[in-house]
Design a protein with these regions (language model features):
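Hydrophobic beta-sheet segments that form the core/acyl-binding groove
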Residues: 111-160, 168, 323-368
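Flexible glycine-rich active-site/ligand-binding loops centered on an Asp-His dyad
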Residues: 145-158, 168-189, 379-384
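Ligand-binding pocket scaffold of soluble enzyme catalytic domains
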Residues: 171, 175, 327, 344-351, ...
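Short low-polarity hydrophobic stretches
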Residues: 48, 77, 345-347, 370
């Protein structure tokens, strides 16, 4: 019986019907059952920043943040994925039926994102999230063979004043687990083992890292070709994954009775582990055995974690007075447990957009195998010696919402 169930766990196929059911979901707002953080409390923001190794006091010290231009603590850009309550409470039954079971039981691998930031998320904010499936495309899969389905989700976050804080597009690639698993044995990936000398080099690298912080980086002082300070992440350990989960959370991963209740609601989210016990399918991030069954030789990191690394690279460079307007990244390869990454970037463009003094950055994350696993671009708005503080960008007006207390 358990063997039959394990076969079902990896045997789901991408079919024409499944693709059409997925397309039926486009534009339908999806309610969130329960955010990890309903409120952006001081502790929630701090714990999120710490979960990926960010020591910026703007995200962790109310006393420090009170003396910045923000007059209080703000959240790192990707904190929003831990929060956001839904206005829509359910999908109409006739709409739900059209998309029922769409591509259930196949991989959904995080492949990249575009993040646009318009307002800071402040301590004690209660955000609303509006999430829809934005697009569905069918492509050939180099990862698993056969076809894959690329879907993009759009998440819009609004504060209690109805202002858009963040628009986030996330790309997922859906592949068949069994096909991907069959190719796993053909992939040769050397797992990292480090010497004491290398560990000392890592310690020295961490000791040398600096943060711009309270010293403004003025637009006039930046030149095309300037290099960003390198930032080290790793070697990645299972403890790092635990730390990430502590701060970023997943409301679906619950123990005991709560886990049982969630399994009744979302049975396809669970597969049998090596002990014959149902466990969350996302354990590929800490369970080598399950990772191999879905097409990866080893357990690997979360895409959102690497996105947070990129945000830290940018915030360390721009300082407290800068504003990251846009971040676009790709996740081209897994970051396995044991991997080490160096993040870096260069200034590729300076320009003026209305009242905003902008800088464009090429950024990347490169592992110990000299693979760029996550390239990207960022647009930063900087303060100006001549024109004053960085001016925040305007969100698309059609996404702003009027609140009852607006008058």
């Amino acid at each position: 019986m358990a063997d039959d169930q394990r076969t079902q766990d990896v045997g789901a196929r991408i079919t024409d019907e499944g693709i059409e059911r997925m397309r039926a979901r486009i534009g339908v707002e999806v309610p969130k059952e329960q955010p990890w953080n309903e409120y952006a409390t001081v502790d929630a923001i701090r714990h999120f920043a710490w979960s990926y190794g960010d020591d910026n006091p703007l995200y962790s010290s109310p006393e420090y943040a009170a003396n910045t231009r923000w007059k209080g603590m703000i959240a790192p850009p990707t904190f929003v994925h831990t929060t956001g309550v839904s206005v829509v409470k359910e999908i109409p039954p006739e709409v739900r039926e059209k998309g029922k079971g769409a591509l259930a039981g196949v991989n959904a691998l995080f492949a990249g994102n575009v993040l646009e930031c318009f307002q800071p998320v402040r301590a004690d904010d209660r955000l609303i999230e509006r999430r829809v499936l934005h697009s569905v495309d069918v492509k050939e899969s180099r990862f698993s063979g056969g076809i894959s389905v690329h879907n993009i989700d759009r998440q819009v976050y609004l504060n209690e004043q109805g202002q858009v804080t963040t628009i986030w597009f996330k790309r997922f690639i859906r592949t068949e687990r069994q096909r991907a698993s069959e190719k796993t044995g053909k992939r040769t990936v050397e797992r990292a083992v480090y010497t004491q000398e290398q560990l000392r080099e890592f310690d020295e690298a961490y000791a040398s890292e600096t943060r711009r912080g309270a010293e403004p980086r003025y637009w006039e002082d930046v030149k095309v070709g300037d290099a960003m300070q390198a930032m080290l992440k790793g070697p990645l350990t299972l403890s790092d994954v635990v730390a990430w989960m502590q701060g970023s959370g997943r409301a679906e991963i619950l123990p005991s009775r709560l886990g049982w209740k969630n399994r009744q609601r979302h049975p396809k989210f669970y597969t049998l582990n090596d002990f014959g016990v149902p466990e969350a399918a996302m354990r590929c991030h800490w369970d080598d055995s399950w990772a191999r069954k879905i097409g990866s030789p080893y357990a690997f990191d979360m895409g959102n974690m690497r996105t947070a690394w990129h945000c830290q690279l940018v915030s360390d460079w721009m300082g407290d007075d800068g504003w990251m307007w846009r971040l676009e990244t790709q996740i081209r390869a897994f970051s396995y447990i044991g991997d080490t990454h160096w993040l870096g970037g260069t200034v590729t463009r300076k320009y003026v957009d209305g009242e905003r003094r902008c800088v464009e950055l090429d950024i990347w994350a490169r592992n110990q195998r000299d693979e760029v696993t996550s390239p990207g671009k960022a647009i930063v708005i900087l303060p100006s010696r001549r024109h004053g503080p960085a001016t925040l960008p305007a969100a698309p007006p059609e996404l702003e919402e009027r609140r009852p207390n607006d008058g």
